[in-house]
């Protein structure tokens, strides 16, 4: 069981900034770890894949920013929408940008293929959070 989970998405790109690739993930506030993540476009389908990965965890309180798709997907659940309660996951986004140059907004480092982009970020999350 997860008492408080923060959810957010982080922007990245593959090849050119017009080819966006989003990292959606959930962060356990109490354990300070990433619970699940998925890559894809910034759509309801990608959010649905993340929610299906999170369904076995029985999250009590969801904390997100004001993105409208979170509101529609979390209807009927205890859902807090405030920037104040997403500070930890936003800090984690900053840590990811600092540790992985390919996530930097203005960087000469970038991914050239979707597969490599997903594997590098997934491997980093695996080492830091899943082991």
Swiss-Prot record:
NCBIfam families: transpos_IS1 (NF033558). One of its GO terms (molecular function) is transposase activity. PANTHER family: INSERTION ELEMENT IS1 1 PROTEIN INSB-RELATED. This is Insertion element iso-IS1d protein InsB. It comes from the Bacteria. Transmembrane segments: none annotated. Belongs to the transposase 27 family. Keywords: DNA recombination, Transposable element, Transposition. Absolutely required for transposition of IS1. The keyword ATP-binding does not apply. The gene is insB. GO terms for biological process: DNA transposition. InterPro entries: Transposase_27 (IPR005063), Transposase_27_IS1 (IPR051354).
């Amino acid at each position: 069981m997860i008492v408080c989970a923060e959810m957010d998405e982080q922007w990245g790109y593959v090849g050119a900034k017009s080819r966006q690739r989003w990292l959606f993930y959930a962060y356990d506030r109490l354990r300070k770890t990433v619970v699940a993540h998925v890559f894809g476009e910034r759509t309801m389908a990608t959010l649905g894949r993340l929610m299906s990965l999170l369904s076995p965890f029985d999250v009590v309180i969801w904390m997100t920013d004001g993105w409208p798709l979170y509101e529609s997907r979390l209807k009927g659940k205890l859902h807090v929408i405030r920037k104040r309660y997403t500070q930890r996951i936003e800090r984690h986004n900053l840590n990811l940008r600092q540790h992985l140059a390919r996530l930097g907004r203005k960087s000469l480092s970038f991914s050239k293929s979707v597969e490599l982009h997903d594997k590098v970020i997934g491997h980093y999350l695996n080492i830091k959070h899943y082991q």
